[in-house]
Amino acid sequence: MNTKELIASELASIIDSLDQEAILKLLETPKNSEMGDIAFPAFSLAKVERKAPQMIAAELAEKMNSQAFEKVVATGPYVNFFLDKSAISAQVLQAVTTEKEHYADQNIGKQENVVIDMSSPNIAKPFSIGHLRSTVIGDSLSHIFQKIGYQTVKVNHLGDWGKQFGMLIVAYKKWGDEEAVKAHPIDELLKLYVRINAEAENDPSLDEEAREWFRKLENGDEEALALWQWFRDESLVEFNRLYNELKVEFDSYNGEAFYNDKMDAVVDILSEKGLLLESEGAQVVNLEKYGIEHPALIKKSDGATLYITRDLAAALYRKNEYQFAKSIYVVGQEQSAHFKQLKAVLQEMGYDWSDDITHVPFGLVTKEGKKLSTRKGNVILLEPTVAEAVSRAKVQIEAKNPELENKDQVAHAVGIGAIKFYDLKTDRTNGYDFDLEAMVSFEGETGPYVQYAYARIQSILRKADFKPETAGNYSLNDTESWEIIKLIQDFPRIINRAADNFEPSIIAKFAISLAQSFNKYYAHTRILDESPERDSRLALSYATAVVLKEALRLLGVEAPEKM
């Protein structure tokens, strides 16, 4: 039970009109620590008790007598709790030195499955910074859900089907060079894709030709299938090289094409349940009762199925295959309407588990305020960007620590970590402007800043030759260390909030706060000096390092021991 839960429990025993859960939600952290560590506002009780909130606060403060608090005082309409710093710091330091990286592990998920649909780049197109968002958010959510006791299944739903393959086949047959594609698959295929789109704007016959080739592909034409398979294989080799660099792995690469033979079954179920309506020759499902104006278009008048049909097939397959407790789609917010339709159609089909499906949308990445577009060739490609980030990180490491042994390895961890962290510290639904210089900076709210704080602590611990004792009698009661103790104690709740909101930025912001608090502590406290508090200060440094490293791991970011 953490401190807030303890306070909520104690208050619930003397408040009749609110239960522990409701009280927990009302608890606040005062902005000024002189007003206590935790505050309970009495406003919500005024109506029921028919008393002024100030009077209620005074009465509650008088009734509280737990040993866990230094004091409990009423200040206006608030009950302010001052915690026993020595007792709580002893508990927290004991917990972290004993549990180490397993501190804050929980078993909320009871080993149930969470399926995460993430990354999903388009075959034959470069892996851009736009795909990076889905990749790093999905990967971080996987770590977060595992931390609270779920098993995760990471699915890379590759964009390996669609009319764009018709366009690509036409372009390749007109202008393609097999050797050039083999040498630089994605670069060459992107050039062909951009060229055919540009020419199609003035020549509509190219569009028709592309549609015809895609029809051939759908009908199993040998030449079309061979080209499609080749484009897919070459692209995957390149994608996997990037995933290895990002240290992201997947449990399934079943993309759009995997569901080609599974869509007719979906149409049959919809038909059997009487859910399909005819509309201008097409077959649709009406979703007005869910407040969705546009019906879900299941089959076009020419018999072609659509994205939603494919996603329905994927949802049914995944439920059957993985028996998921949650199914998460980490896909841009421009797809929100699509996922509302998907859930509503599944609900219409009578599947209660549609409630377990969540679209986790994210905002756009821009460059100098401009939207990125593969079709127009205006993209930030990941591979050269990673190389540039690593190079910039190395320059700064050379300046800070020219004697460092494994500079290249550390620069790699810092450069890639910088890109990931910058993305993940942004509230997921917000976009951000891509600025490599800001990302790789060792100052400010960045990944390198947090990594450097961790490496600095490791240096302190090496100098002291500190090995934490699981039964160590560690305890602190000064104001500077108290700020750190409160953050470390809050880590389990932070992880839960990140999971509940599908929001890795909560962890990233926590890591920044913890690194800042430790750096402030380091500036004011002579940690290594001989004093009665020396071991406790070292234990606090150790606990901070453990939690910083674990917070970074939950974001998919490495923590180098030396920098």
From Swiss-Prot:
- Motif 'HIGH' region per record, residues: 121-131
GO cellular component terms, A-Z: cytoplasm
> Its GO biological process terms?
arginyl-tRNA aminoacylation
Family matches, as InterPro entries: Arg-tRNA-ligase (IPR001278), Arg-tRNA-synth_N (IPR005148), Arg-tRNA-synth_N_sf (IPR036695), ArgRS_core (IPR035684), DALR_anticod-bd (IPR008909), Rossmann-like_a/b/a_fold (IPR014729), tRNAsynth_Ia_anticodon-bd (IPR009080)
EC number(s) stated in the UniProt entry for this protein = 6.1.1.19
Q: Which residues form the signal peptide?
A: none
Record keywords: Aminoacyl-tRNA synthetase, ATP-binding, Cytoplasm, Ligase, Nucleotide-binding, Protein biosynthesis
Compartment(s) of residence: Cytoplasm
The organism's superkingdom is given as Bacteria
Presence of keyword Ligase: yes
Q: Which PANTHER family match?
A: ARGININE--TRNA LIGASE, CYTOPLASMIC (PTHR11956:SF5), ARGINYL-TRNA SYNTHETASE (PTHR11956)
The record's listing under HAMAP family reads: Arg_tRNA_synth (MF_00123)
Subunit text: Monomer.
Q: What is this protein called?
A: Arginine--tRNA ligase
Point out the gene that encodes the protein: argS
